[in-house]
Design a protein with these regions (language model features):
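PRPP-associated nucleotide enzymes
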Residues: 1-125, 133-219
């Protein structure tokens, strides 16, 4: 495993973003681990998260300009911190996010920040894709921007579990919309990380058992 992936998983665990136990996903599945960017609470943590997203962005896209979109609410801080981290790397990208409820006074509208123009490409930054519902909601919101194309989606973790079909939710989104979905790490990276310490044996077994039932087929 690459060193930055190990560092990222350790960061998620230390920050309380990655938890092990008994949880219920939006899909209704009982899951043995949970990922929640809402547990990032300090400036140091969000700055570090932004640097990991920026590294992933530069590896996958390079210094190709685009506009970062962070869906409310968790995606907002990810978009802002990623834009700052990219600026530190010499790539100055604009960002924007949506309001949950449209504002009918002042500047008004659904979006806050830079509003992409016709022909510009948007990169969506999210914490995780479980069933793909949030991405589909984002696509509906962004469809009101004429001539704007979504180029990619970046998330923290690919859970590698079934979506609506035998494919993963990420693969389903890619197939449905025609753009790539990238993750900093996937669940098998997490398993490899956990296996380095014998005290994690129970969590490793539970995750493997879960994937044996709910794991997606590779494409």
């Amino acid at each position: 495993m690459e060193a930055y992936k190990r560092e990222f998983i350790a960061f998620l665990e230390e920050a309380g973003v990655l938890k092990f136990g008994d949880f219920t996903a939006k899909s209704g599945r009982k899951i043995p681990y949970f990922i929640n960017a809402g547990d990032i609470k300090t400036g140091e943590q969000i700055a570090k998260l932004g640097r990991f997203y920026a590294k992933s962005y530069l590896e996958k896209i390079g210094k190709k300009p685009s506009v970062l979109y962070g869906p409310a609410y968790k995606g907002i801080s990810i978009a802002v911190s990623s834009a700052v981290a990219l600026a530190d790397e010499g790539l100055n990208v604009p960002f924007f996010f949506n309001r949950k409820e449209a504002k009918d006074h002042g500047e008004g509208g659904v979006f806050v920040g830079y509003v992409p123009q016709n022909g510009e490409q948007v990169v969506i930054v999210e914490d995780v894709i479980t069933a793909g519902t949030a991405i589909r909601e984002s696509m509906e919101i962004l469809s009101h921007l004429d001539g704007v194309k979504v180029a990619a989606v970046f998330v923290m973790v690919d859970r590698k579990e079934k979506g609506k079909t035998e494919l993963s939710a990420m693969a389903e989104v890619e197939r449905e919309f025609g753009f790539p979905v990238y993750s900093v790490v996937d669940v098998y990276d997490i398993i490899e990380y956990l296996e380095e310490d014998p005290k994690n044996e129970e969590n490793v077994t539970r995750i493997k058992n879960y994937l044996a039932v709910n794991g997606a087929k590779s494409v």
